[in-house]
Amino acid sequence: MCDQQKQPQFPPSCVKGSGLGAGQGSNGASVKCPVPCQTQTVCVTGPAPCPTQTYVKYQVPCQTQTYVKCPAPCQRTYVKYPTPCQTYVKCPAPCQTTYVKCPTPCQTYVKCPAPCQMTYIKSPAPCQTQTCYVQGASPCQSYYVQAPASGSTSQYCVTDPCSAPCSTSYCCLAPRTFGVSPLRRWIQRPQNCNTGSSGCCENSGSSGCCGSGGCGCSCGCGSSGCCCLGIIPMRSRGPACCDHEDDCCC
């Protein structure tokens, strides 16, 4: 639990409110300060060896910040507020530093807590998310940050459903067309993806295709392959198709 002496100490000009995230528990707090914003120290509770303090610094013209508790294995804090504000969040050792940067048009760079590796997310206008999933050790899962919806200023932490229990997959770039070799492919599937429960396919053949419901749609890759790109359907077997020796994930 947080020490009584380490509770948030807000400047006299700051007013504690009940903004986004504050209703999730006593670990959340919403603070609104007039320009120029001051640096706040917020006490959050987390299981060992997670720290109990998160230091949050935000810049002008930010006026409202919301402290949001993120998923296990570390209960840390993100700050949500409108662009073009930037956030610098530091978790003392052994947790790693997390940087969240949201300039227009919704581009994000995130470093996940140990033992997770980095996750890079780029959300070009109009805020379409492209995610690279990364390796994580148990009980950690790969994280990503979802781009804000239209008209929304919030961002939040969620886990990759294909990552549990902390398997490995790699970023897959779209292949070039007209017979040119792809830039990169999925080179390792997340665990248990051959069941199709996570939108992944293995040894699927002509009747198996990666879709939102798993393996089961027909996509014209021929008798020995499966379309597996998600956003660009292939009409013939090519770099986006899976064979019996391939594993792919949409």
From Swiss-Prot:
InterPro entries in the record: KPLCE
GO biological process, one term: epidermis development
Tissue: Skin-specific.
Name assigned to this protein: Protein KPLCE
Top-level taxonomy: Eukaryota, Metazoa, Chordata, Craniata, Vertebrata
